[in-house]
């Protein structure tokens, strides 16, 4: 087991081509520098638990494998600190990737201090500092002019230095799981930034400078405290994905409609009572997430989103759908789970590309015949819908693979259920069924285990 641990540690610490010289001698030399550095901080780990010796053995275990160096230095207070580089700096200065992520070195997972020394690594292209306890970044971070990826996920950052704006080659910035309330205006200087992850912070608004990120393709602001978005967000002409789940938005700025390259917008779990009209201008939108809001109507203008492929309206307060929904000819999935629908428009039958239709937890007692014309359906969810009967036309859905009829009032099923030869999952839980049609039982036997039927009384399959 110890040998396995040594090998794993070696994989985390041995040099990578173009990052550190791939020879055992230089690797041992690096270890010696680490020992020297530890001694200079007043803490020598060489004897107390064999960590340095395990490090050397790990390097020997796979010296020829390509991976990156991962290392930290512990200061005399027991805190994890990168405070200076070893005396032989050439090996460090050549690094283009450095990973100090807490999950890799379990012994060193609480890095609290990142000193200005980091700014000397001018060739660095990727820096990973996730899962530590950093509260600030040094201004010297701005000296990493070649940095392309910076990952600071799961730290304790409350602010970013203005010098972050000097990272002109930065393409990906991950600030997920911190305590940020604002971004410096200098963030707008990151002209090559393509991905910005700000999930689970404490933002209530964004700076206007966000609109200067002309190459931004994805921004994720899930689980913050946003009540508004700046109008400047409409300037992000290359934006393709906008994630706003779990905020406090009641509307969107009209400028959202200028995002003509937007493919996906997710507004789950906000406070929308009406659909912002700017949404209808997003002609290239493919995925619209509106679940967990307070929508009571869906306007006819939804039909303008001709490229829409997925529409999620789960857990709102809809009582009807507009007939114009039938004009969404590219729609492949619609989720209407947990609304107040009693019927569907007849135009639903026009959605011939529809593959998934989720209608659970509504107030249906019967279903419109038009559903049975959706020949490409592979998933139909009708759970908790107050159904007392199921029409024979169910047998027309020859491509159906998943059918959920749980939590209804069904006492019988039509014989045509046996025609669903592609079905592999049928949920009938919580229905007062007294028997199953012979055709369904025969289908179950013929599928030889490929069809899973969930029943309160499995004995019904044996009758």
Q: What is the role of each PLM region?
A:
Residues 131:
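Aromatic-flanked redox-active Cys/Sec active sites in thiol-based oxidoreductases
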Residues 414:
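Glycine/serine-rich loop-strand microenvironments at binding/catalytic pocket rims
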Residues 2-120, 126-128, 142, 148-151, ...:
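The feature captures the LRR N-terminal capping module
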């Amino acid at each position: 087991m110890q040998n396995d641990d040594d090998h794993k540690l070696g994989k985390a610490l041995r040099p990578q081509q173009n990052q550190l010289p791939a020879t055992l001698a230089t690797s041992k030399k690096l270890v010696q520098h680490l020992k020297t550095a530890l001694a200079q901080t007043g803490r020598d780990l060489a004897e107390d638990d064999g960590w340095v010796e395990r490090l050397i053995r790990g390097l020997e275990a796979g010296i020829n494998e390509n991976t990156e160096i991962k290392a930290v230095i512990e200061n005399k207070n027991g805190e994890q600190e990168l405070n200076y580089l070893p005396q032989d700096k050439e090996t460090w200065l050549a690094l283009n990737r450095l990973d100090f992520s807490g999950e890799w070195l379990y012994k060193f997972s609480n890095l609290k201090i990142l000193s200005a020394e980091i700014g000397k690594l001018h060739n660095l292209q990727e820096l990973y500092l996730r899962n530590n306890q950093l509260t600030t970044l040094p201004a010297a971070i701005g000296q990493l002019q070649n940095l392309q990826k910076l990952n600071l996920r799961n730290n304790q950052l409350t602010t970013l230095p203005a010098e972050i704006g000097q990272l002109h080659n930065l393409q990906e910035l991950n600030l997920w799981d911190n305590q940020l309330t604002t971004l410096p205006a200098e963030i707008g200087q990151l002209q090559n930034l393509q991905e910005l992850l700000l999930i689970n912070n404490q933002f209530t608004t964004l700076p206007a400078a966000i609109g200067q990120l002309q190459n931004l393709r994805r921004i994720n602001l899930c689980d913050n405290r946003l009540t508004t978005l700046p109008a400047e967000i409409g300037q992000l002409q290359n934006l393709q994905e906008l994630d706003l789940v779990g905020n406090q938005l009641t509307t969107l700025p009209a400028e959202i409609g200028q995002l003509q390259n937007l493919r996906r917008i997710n507004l789950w779990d906000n406070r929308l009572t009406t659909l912002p009209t700017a949404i209808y201008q997003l002609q290239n939108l493919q995925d619209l997430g509106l679940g967990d809001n307070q929508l009571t109507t869906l306007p006819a203008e939804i039909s303008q989103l001709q490229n829409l492929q997925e529409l999620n309206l789960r857990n709102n307060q809809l009582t009807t759908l507009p007939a114009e929904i039938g004009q969404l000819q590219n729609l492949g999935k619609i989720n209407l789970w947990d609304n107040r629908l009693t019927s569907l428009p007849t135009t639903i039958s026009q959605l011939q590309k529809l593959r998934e239709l989720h209608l659970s937890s509504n107030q249906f007692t019967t279903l419109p015949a038009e559903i049975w014309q959706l020949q490409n359906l592979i998933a139909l969810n009708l759970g908790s819908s107050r159904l007392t009967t199921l029409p024979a036309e169910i047998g027309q859905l020859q491509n159906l693979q998943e059918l959920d009829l749980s939590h209804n009032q069904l006492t019988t099923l039509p014989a045509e259920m046996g025609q669903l030869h592609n079905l592999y999952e049928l949920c009938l839980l919580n229905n007062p069924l007294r028997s199953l049609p012979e055709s369904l039982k025969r289908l179950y036997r013929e599928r030889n285990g490929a069809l899973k039927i969930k029943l309160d009384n499995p004995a019904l399959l044996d009758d």
